[in-house]
Regions:
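Extended, hydrophobic/aromatic-rich amphipathic alpha-helical segments that build helical scaffolds
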Residues: 25, 42-73, 88-102
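Plant-biased detector of terminal regions, especially N-terminal secretory signal peptides
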Residues: 13-14, 64, 123
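Flexible, polar/acidic helix-loop-strand segments at domain edges
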Residues: 3-47
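Hydrophobic aliphatic residue packing
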Residues: 1-2, 73
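Long, intrinsically disordered, low-complexity segments
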Residues: 35-38, 43-45, 82-161
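A broad, low-specificity signal marking well-ordered, structured residues that form hydrophobic/aromatic
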Residues: 21, 70, 107
Length: 161
C-alpha cells in the first residue's frame, strides 16, 4: 500500500491525497471471480436510491416535504440520524453520499448552481489551493469540433470559441 499524504500543497504526485476503493471484483460470497479479465460485478443502470433522491428533490423544489424519501434512504443505509427538514444543502449532501465515486457529482453540482460559483468550494477548484469560483461557461461542455463541422447550423458553446 502506498503511504499517502492527506494534506498537500500540490496535486502532482500519485500518493498525494486520499484513495478510495468502492467496487471490487469479488463475488458476493467473497470468493475470487471466475475470470480476472472480465468483472463478475453487475453494473446498475438506475438505482432505487436515484428514484428516491430525484423524487425528494422534485418535492423540495416545489415547496413540499421530502423528509420521507431522505429518511427511507438513510434507513436502508443503516443511518440512525433522521432529518427533520430537508434543505438544499441536505439534498446535495445526500446525492454525494449515495453516489460517491459514481461519476455524477459534476452534473449534480451544475443542477444545484454550485459547480462554477463560490457557493461550494473544494481544494484546487479554479486552480486555487483553497478553491475559487470559475467562469459560468464551464457548466456546459464544449461541443466536439467534428459535430460543428458536420452541422453548419451549430455553433460552439460560449467560452469555448
Amino acid at each position: 500500500m502506498y503511504k499517502r499524504q492527506i494534506q498537500t500543497d500540490a496535486i502532482s504526485g500519485f500518493t498525494d491525497g486520499l484513495s478510495i476503493v468502492k467496487w471490487q471484483n469479488y463475488r458476493s460470497d467473497g470468493k475470487p471471480v471466475s475470470h480476472a479479465t472480465y468483472p463478475d460485478t453487475d453494473i446498475p443502470l438506475f438505482r432505487l436510491a436515484e428514484a428516491y433522491l430525484t423524487r425528494a428533490e422534485a418535492i423540495f423544489r416545489q415547496g413540499g416535504d421530502a423528509t420521507g424519501d431522505i429518511n427511507e434512504l438513510r434507513k436502508r443505509a443503516n443511518c440512525t440520524r433522521k432529518v427533520q427538514t430537508v434543505t438544499e444543502q441536505e439534498l446535495i449532501d445526500e446525492w454525494a453520499r449515495e453516489f460517491y465515486l459514481e461519476g455524477r457529482r459534476r452534473s449534480d453540482l451544475v443542477r444545484f448552481g454550485m459547480f462554477t460559483t463560490n457557493k461550494y468550494l473544494w481544494d484546487w477548484k479554479g486552480g486555487a489551493m483553497n478553491g475559487t469560483s470559475v467562469a459560468s461557461y464551464y457548466n456546459k461542455y464544449p461541443i466536439p469540433v467534428s459535430d460543428i463541422n458536420n452541422n453548419r447550423n451549430m455553433s460552439q458553446n460560449e467560452g469555448y470559441k
